[in-house]
């Protein structure tokens, strides 16, 4: 994190207004402005583990990663600066949670790119903190209001679920494929064979659907699931529990918190971070897999057909094969051999 996002650059146009403010930053925190902003006090709350990693180096205990904010996260703050994400239900979940903890009268700022749908903030907060647009620049909007009424927030009411092949999939706002199985994961699932054994790592696990489906017809498999997203981690735990399955689930920035080696790594890696296209996670996944696969272990991923993963797979493992494809997606497989670059 170094260069500021367009949303942060819009905020910096108003930096003089915040010198006496005690600010809680939340939402889609794509840079380190919360650590560098000149104000009386700065805290941050994030649901994204990689954002917490970057900010905690400078902010220490003043930034927290979790599914929901708690009273201690907003303590003494008189201002909320919320970075609008591209996912509207995620924004609603986070704003209702945070504003339920803040006292009436606090300043509420919402900033985001126009293409992210930041305009939705006005109707969303109309009953709680009526907003006015105070700036428009860098294809972003900045909105301000004061909290007039605290919303009610209950985590239980935000859970949703759907069924696939007799499995119950539990989801939360902000989890990939919240409303049903995506086409890419469906294609990857079609390649998984029954009676798989050994240790399997599911990177970017989302709601846990890949692992749950695999374990349902491979009872001897030992599952480990990880994701950068706090909602995804909680959803995966809930999915496993709902189906009587066992597995270790934790937050990790690709392999950052992963220990040991596995017989198979499966993933539907993201290629967006917020509004930005980013292949970083997938590249880290492919190049790092050699340090987390047993000899003969395999990496199996699904990706949009236009993404340049074959080149990275060949550079890292020496070869790859396409084991399933549609017009839009391909499932790539490669194996840990002596020629892999460790």
UniProtKB/Swiss-Prot annotation:
Top EC group? transferase
| Database matches in Gene3D superfamilies | Vaccinia Virus protein VP39
Q: What is its EC number?
A: 2.1.1.172
Output one GO MF annotation.
Answer: nucleic acid binding
Q: Which keywords, in A-to-Z order, does the entry hold?
A: Cytoplasm, Methyltransferase, rRNA processing, S-adenosyl-L-methionine, Transferase
Annotated Gene Ontology cellular components are:
cytoplasm
- Give the superkingdom in one word: Bacteria
Give the subcellular location: Cytoplasm
Give me the reactions it catalyses: guanosine(1207) in 16S rRNA + S-adenosyl-L-methionine = N(2)-methylguanosine(1207) in 16S rRNA + S-adenosyl-L-homocysteine + H(+)
Q: Which InterPro entries match?
A: DNA_methylase_N6_adenine_CS, Mtase_sm_N, rRNA_ssu_MeTfrase_C, RsmC/RlmG, SAM-dependent_MTases_sf, Small_mtfrase_dom
Give the multimer and partner information.
Monomer.
Under the heading HAMAP family, the entry gives:
16SrRNA_methyltr_C
Family of this protein: Belongs to the methyltransferase superfamily. RsmC family.
| Annotated PANTHER family | RIBOSOMAL RNA SMALL SUBUNIT METHYLTRANSFERASE C
Purpose? Specifically methylates the guanine in position 1207 of 16S rRNA in the 30S particle.
- Would you tell me the protein name for this molecule? Ribosomal RNA small subunit methyltransferase C
This chain's source organism reads: Salmonella heidelberg (strain SL476)
Instruction: Point out the gene that encodes the protein.
Output: rsmC
